[in-house]
Amino acid sequence: MKKKKMISISLLLTFSLAIALLIVFISILQPEHLHVMEYYDVRVVNGFTDNSSLPLVIWCASKDSDLGGRALQERDDFSWQLSTNFWSATHFSCTIKWDQKRKSFDAFKAPRDAYRCSPLRRCSWLVKEDGFYFSNDDVHWRKDFSW
């Protein structure tokens, strides 16, 4: 009987500790830091302006979803919607090829883009001759990196 009572007390203490830790964890996390199951629009635009007859070839995928490839003519775009997973580890990468140039980049990476794509939850990329530009409103573009 004494052993049974000790096990019950031990389980009760373990359960109480788990609840206390859960309360502490929830109180530390601010709602603005939670980006679980949020939806984002991601867009990649062919921003070449030299009237090239060569398309911008793009292929995008995550570890769970292959979006396939597209051949984008000037001003064409490739867009998709995604939702972040529970661990905020959602990650889509794209490989872009134009003429002899080839570049892989992170089109969406949850830890980086949860804030960067706010407040509209829009992550847009404009691919130009001199590099890759990012915008979260499709108006203000900032060069993120070169080819």
Task: Please tell me what each predicted stretch does.
Residues 2-87, 95-147:
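Intrinsically disordered, low-complexity segments enriched in small/polar residues
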